[in-house]
Design a protein with these regions (language model features):
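N-terminal targeting/trafficking signals and adjacent low-complexity tails
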Residues: 2, 14-15, 43, 93, ...
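Residues at the starts of beta-strands that form the adenosine-phosphate
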Residues: 47-48, 71, 124
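Glycine-rich P-loop/Walker A and Walker A-like loops and their local beta1-loop-alpha1 context
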Residues: 7-53
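Short acidic, S/G/P-rich loop/turn micro-motifs used as interaction or catalytic elements
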Residues: 25-29, 56-58, 79-81, 104-108
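Long, charge-dense
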Residues: 52, 56-97
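A short acidic, amphipathic alpha-helical/loop segment
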Residues: 35-36, 61, 85-89, 110-114
């Protein structure tokens, strides 16, 4: 039994992956994701918040949500396969606090590879997908 009155917070969040599932075709995807990105951009310390995306992200949109772009690294990819491997590299390198990506549908092996990369880089991964 944990005594929450005396329990100490964890100094570093555990590495690993989190999935966020959005309804396909919704025009409010930006409104769901950007507040999280803004929060994470202010929590990353000396490490990057890396966002791997296929779509260009307008600078004004980032400004509207108060994203700290001085700690945000945007990486644009051409397709799901490229996004998968860029995400793996960003997770494994260890210079990102969190890597956000939408690599498309992943099989079990690909998901496990990303999990191992996050552990190797002591990094959080946020995978966004649509259903």
């Amino acid at each position: 039994v944990t005594n929450f009155n005396t329990a100490q917070p964890i100094a570093q969040p555990a590495s690993g992956l989190t999935e966020l599932v959005l309804t396909q075709g919704t025009s409010q995807s930006w409104q769901m994701v950007l507040p999280m990105i803004a929060h994470l951009s202010r929590q990353c310390g000396q490490r990057w918040l890396t966002w791997v995306t296929r779509e260009p992200v307008p600078a004004q949109l980032l400004a509207n949500f108060n994203v700290d772009t001085s700690r945000l690294r945007l990486v644009h990819c051409k397709n799901d396969e490229q996004q998968l491997w860029v995400s793996w590299d960003a997770l494994a390198l260890g210079n990102s606090h969190t890597v956000i990506a939408s690599p498309g549908k992943l099989n079990k092996r690909e998901f496990e590879q990303l999990e191992r990369a996050a552990q190797l880089g002591q990094c959080q991964g946020l995978l966004i997908r649509e259903r």
